[in-house]
Amino acid sequence: LTELHQLPLNKNICSVFDIYLARVKRIATSLNAAFLDMGQDKDAFLHYHDLGPHYNHSRDYVNNTINKKSTRWNQLKANFKDPLSKDGLIDKVLKKDDTVLVQVSKEPISTKGPRVVAEISLAGRYLVLVPFSNRISVSQKIRDEKEKKRLSRLIKSIVPDGFGVVIRTVAKNKKVIDLDTDL
């Protein structure tokens, strides 16, 4: 996130993979979840498990960007020492009126609002880019160990620090220029 653009919001359209800057409206401790105001007609649902292991880094970066403090990516990129506990409680991480960067994972239906995740991923043709991660993984459908190592080595040489990558099956036998262009 190097720029923050605010666009007029269409309250009737909310699609999977859309990214929103949302505000915590209510914490539901019994569900270990939060309801978020994204500017839509219905509040979004964010479960604790959907925060992702590196939520704290994402939160700090977003808050620094909003508050116009230093937003240099390299100041937050490599410190992944303290991932969120898998069995934690949402009220220990979020509170009312917190700002959260989220991505829609399930569209709203009937009376329910959209389901969202705080672990953002940006899908391309050959790669899926995951900010605030340092993990590179290769599709399990690529069985050739030599090709897996080649792809991992290529991606490590081109991926920016502070980003993780999932290498998709269609990346098999692709040249570095194709992968770099997709990135």
Predicted regions and their residues:
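Single-stranded RNA-binding surfaces
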Residues: 1-183
